[in-house]
Amino acid sequence: MPTGDFDSKPSWADQVEEEGEDDKCVTSELLKGIPLPTGDTSPEPELLPGDPLPPPKEVINGNIKTVTEYKVEEDGKKFKIVRTFRIETRKASKAVARRKNWKKFGNSEFDPPGPNVATTTVSDDVSMTFITSKEDLNCQEEEDPMNKLKGQKIVSCRICKGDHWTTRCPYKDTLGPMQKELAEQLGLSTGEKEKLPGELEPVQAAQNKTGKYVPPSLRDGASRRGESMQPNRRADDNATIRVTNLSEDTRETDLQELFRPFGSISRIYLAKDKTTGQSKGFAFISFHRREDAARAIAGVSGFGYDHLILNVEWAKPSTN
C-alpha cells in the first residue's frame, strides 16, 4: 500500500497536551491562526498560571452573538469556552414583555437578561384553550332516559332485599332459615301451600327410599283421581293469568318465587323452545282462587323483572 509523508500542522489539542507541563493551555501564538466566529482574528490574552482569569467577553455581529468565557479545571488547567447564539426577534404580548423586565432575585439576582441554563429549562410552548361558560353549557350531555332506570331496582331479593335473585342470595343459607322459622311462628309461612277445603292431603310413601319396588296402587297419589277428572279443572281456567315479555333465562322456579306471595298456585306453564330449551317469552299461571289471580295482575303488571317490563292479563278460557 503506498504511503507518503504529509507535512501537517499539529492540532491545537496536541499542542495543549505537549505544553501541559508548563501549565500553558492557551497562548497567543496558538490563537493567531484560529478565526473567531465573529470574524475577529485579534489575539487572545495569554492564560498564565497564577494570573486572574479574563472577564467574559460578548461580541454581537448582526444577528450573531458570541460569548467567550474562561474557566479553571480542578487540576489547575485553564480553558476557554466560546458560545455562539443566533438572535431572533419575536413579537410577544405586553404581559410577556413586562415579565421579562422583572428584576431577578435569589441565586439569579445578578444574572444577565434572558434564561440561565443553570436555573431555567426551556421547553416547547404549551397552548391553552379557555372555554367560556356558554360553550360549557353546550357541551353538556343530553339527559339519557336510561340513566333514570339505573337507580331503580329491577330485581329485589326476598331475603336481604338486594338487587339480585333470591336463589343467588349469599345469605340464603343463614337468613333464609331464620326468616322461615319466624314466619312459621307468626303463621305466615310461604313455604307451605294453602289447602282448599275439599283438597286431600297427599299420602306420603313410608320408607320409599329403601330401593324396594312399590306398585302403582301403593305409590303417592294412588288414592286420588287424575288431574283431568278433578271438578275444579274448570275453576282453574277462570283463575289463570297470562304473563308476557319474559326473558329467555326465566325458569319455572323464578315464576314460582314471583307469584307465590299473591296466593296458592295450582300449576305453572312456561312456553319453551324445543331445541334450545329457552323461554319463548310468555307463561300461564293458575291460582286456586280468582281473587289471588286478580291481586297478581294488579301487583306484577308493569313490574320491572330481569331488565324487562312484564305484562300480566287474564288468560282466555280454553275452548276444549
Swiss-Prot record:
Top-level taxon of the source organism: Eukaryota
Protein's GO biological process: formation of cytoplasmic translation initiation complex; translational initiation; viral translational termination-reinitiation
Modification Phosphothreonine occurs at: T38, T41
A GO CC annotation given for this chain: perinuclear region of cytoplasm
GO molecular function: RNA binding; translation initiation factor activity
UniProt feature, compositional bias: Basic and acidic residues: 221-233
Pfam families registered for this protein in UniProt: eIF3g, RRM_1
Statement: the UniProt record of this protein carries the keyword Nucleus: yes
SUPFAM superfamilies: RNA-binding domain, RBD
Region (Disordered): 1-60, 205-233
Cellular location(s): Cytoplasm; Nucleus; Cytoplasm, Perinuclear region
Domain RRM: start-end pairs: 239-317
Main localization of the protein described in the UniProt heading: cytoplasm
UniProt modification remark: Phosphorylated. Phosphorylation is enhanced upon serum stimulation.
Keywords: Cytoplasm, Initiation factor, Nucleus, Phosphoprotein, Protein biosynthesis, RNA-binding
Modified residues (Phosphoserine): S8, S11, S42, S189, S223, S264
Homology family: Belongs to the eIF-3 subunit G family.
Oligomer status and interactors: Component of the eukaryotic translation initiation factor 3 (eIF-3) complex, which is composed of 13 subunits: EIF3A, EIF3B, EIF3C, EIF3D, EIF3E, EIF3F, EIF3G, EIF3H, EIF3I, EIF3J, EIF3K, EIF3L and EIF3M. The eIF-3 complex appears to include 3 stable modules: module A is composed of EIF3A, EIF3B, EIF3G and EIF3I; module B is composed of EIF3F, EIF3H, and EIF3M; and module C is composed of EIF3C, EIF3D, EIF3E, EIF3K and EIF3L. EIF3C of module C binds EIF3B of module A and EIF3H of module B, thereby linking the three modules. EIF3J is a labile subunit that binds to the eIF-3 complex via EIF3B.
Job description of the protein: RNA-binding component of the eukaryotic translation initiation factor 3 (eIF-3) complex, which is required for several steps in the initiation of protein synthesis. The eIF-3 complex associates with the 40S ribosome and facilitates the recruitment of eIF-1, eIF-1A, eIF-2:GTP:methionyl-tRNAi and eIF-5 to form the 43S pre-initiation complex (43S PIC). The eIF-3 complex stimulates mRNA recruitment to the 43S PIC and scanning of the mRNA for AUG recognition.
PANTHER family in the cross-refs: EUKARYOTIC TRANSLATION INITIATION FACTOR 3 SUBUNIT G (PTHR10352)
Protein known as: Eukaryotic translation initiation factor 3 subunit G
Species: Rattus norvegicus
Lineage, uppermost ranks: Eukaryota, Metazoa, Chordata, Craniata, Vertebrata
Protein's gene: Eif3g
